[in-house]
Amino acid sequence: MSNRSLSLAAMRGRVARALAGLAMAITLHAAPARAAESCAVTLATPTHLEPAENVGDYRDVLRLCRGDGGGAVAIRTLTLSGQEVLLLADPEKLTTRLESAACWTCEDVEESRIAGTRLMRAVEKSAEAPGLERRGFLQNAGLVHGRAPGSYFTGDLCPSSKPMDRAFLSRLPTERPPTPIALSISGLWLKHHFDDYRWLLDRQADGAFVITWTNHSYHHQFKRGVPFDRNFMNSPGVDPDREILDTEQLLIANGQTPSLFFRFPGLISSAPLMQAAREKHLISLGADAWLADGGKPKPGSIILVHPNGNEPVGLKMFDRDLASGLIAEPFEPLTKAPN
C-alpha cells in the first residue's frame, strides 16, 4: 500500500473515531423524555423513620445508559421492593433522579467515556481544589464559589441535640417560589430529627422551597479539642465509603433523592478523603461565606449556615446581611454553581 493510501486510511480512521465520539456525546446529553415519563421511580413520603435496609444492594457504579430517546450516567444501583433501580445523573445539568433499570440498557465504563462532560469537569475540579493546606489536613477544599450574580444558600444539618430552627427557614425569601436551597444532611441527624425532616418535606411539597440534598456523611465524627488531622472524617477508623453510601441509602429509604454534592463535616478533609469523594463521582462542596466563621458574602457566594440549632449567631448574621443587601439575590440552585 502506498504512503498516500496509508495517510488516507489513517485520516478516515480519525474522522470515524471523531464522528463516533460526537454521536456518543449527542446520545449522552440528549434528554430522555419518554423514558423519564414512564420509568421514574416515585418515592413515598414517609410518615415515620424508615430503615435504610428498605433500600437493598446499594452499590456505587459508573455506567453509560441508553433508553428510549436519550442517555444518562448511572452512579449507583439499588433495589426497592425487589425492583432494580438506577440513580441517574444528568451529565450536563448535574441533576439526579431514580429510574427503573428495566428501562435502560447500561454498560460499565471507564471515566474516559464521559470525559469532557460538565459532570466530570465539576468532579475533577472540586477534587483538585485543596482549599487551605494545613499540616495533616485540608480546610475548605472543593467548590467554594459559584457563578454570579446570585447566591447559593447551603445549610448544614449536623447531628444535634437541639431542634432545627424552622422559623429561620420559614423566613427565607419566597419572591420567586420555590426557593432553591441546599441542605447538607448527616445520617444521624435524620435518624434523630425525623419530625424536622418531615417538616422540610411538607414545606417542599407546599412549594416554599426545593431542596438539593447534599451528603454530609453519616456519623459526622467530632471530638472537641482533638486536632483536625485526627478529627471529623480524619478520625481513626472512619470508612469514607460507608459514610457516603450509608447516608444516601437512608435518604432514599426516607423518600428523597441524593444529589451529586458532598460536604465534609467541619469543612475538614485530606487528600485521601477528597479522592474518596471523587471516586464516588461526587462534587466536594466548601463555602466562601461561612457567616459565623467570618466569611463575607458577595455575588456568587456559596453561603453556609447551620439551621440545626447549633449556630444561632450565623442565622442572625444571615438575616442581617440579607436585609442589608449584602447577600446577592436571587438564590440559585446549587447545580448551577460549577462552571
Describe each PLM feature range:
Residues K162, E175-Q275, E279-I303:
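Metal-dependent polysaccharide deacetylase catalytic core of the NodB/CE4 family, i.e.
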Residues N140, V144, A148-P159, T214, ...:
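Active-site groove signature of glycoside hydrolases
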Residues P159, H219, G309:
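Short, glycine/acidic-enriched loop or turn micro-motifs at the edges of active sites
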